[in-house]
Amino acid sequence: MNILVTGASGGFGELITKILAKDGHQVFATMRGIGGKNVNAAGQLKSWAQGEKLAVEVIELDVTSQDSVDTAIAKVLADAGHIDVVINNAGIASRGPIESFTVAELHHVFDVNTFGSLRINKAILPGMRERKSGLIIQITSSLGRLVIPMGNAYGASKFAMESFAEALHYQLKPFTIDVAIVEPGSFSTPVMENALVGTESRILSAYNAVSNTKPRMPINPSDPQEIADAVKRLVDMPAGTRPLRTVVGTVFTAGVEELNSASEKTTKDLWDSLGLST
């Protein structure tokens, strides 16, 4: 299959690219700055694929730029003809009290995490709808279901992603297009290590003086390979059998499965009351 992965410069995206390429798929590994910031990551991924004789093409794509998205998708379609699977993985983390971020900083978090995947989906869905076939996998977070005090700028963007993805899951069923959500717990990846911190230092100091809301971070976070393995399993499943949500990891995931089950039941009850079908 022809598979597009965003945020493939490292972390989950790189591992997802490699496991799917090893499985025989044509993978379009996208990242921003392949001639600049991520030139080394792009070069290493290309060299790895060439050495393994696997079908990986590295493509420039900045999910916050509509022109970049349009150019990248056009290139993939010109090379491959169509896209079977999209994995929306590109993301940015943030930490600290919401008040410590400027509105522009909060907008940037949402632009990458939420609107970035919406740009991708709008670009690829016409082709999938025309073929009545396709799979969109949205990498969100357990913090898109749970709230921790100083992670909610990031968490809020993930909550929004969850809502958009679930809506698409139902909306695209008549076109036999699957939408699946992967919810990682705590993992050691460059995204979390490079989390955006609010620049309003005076406000940060005020919160630090009175709050004890910094969570105890896990000593042994889960292995990022678990996310790649979960994505592979979803890709391998027959169309129409994939679960809406898949929780991965053991840290920051307690209760998420139960929350998802309760949400699914509540949604079904609501739809039934409206004479609709999920």
Locations of regions flagged by a protein language model:
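Active-site loop-to-helix junction immediately N-terminal to the catalytic Tyr of the SDR YXXXK motif
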Residues: 101, 147-155, 167
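Substrate-binding pocket helix/loop in short-chain dehydrogenase/reductase
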Residues: 97-98, 105-107
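The beta1-alpha1 cofactor-binding region of Rossmann-like NAD(H)/NADP(H)-dependent oxidoreductases
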Residues: 60-71, 103
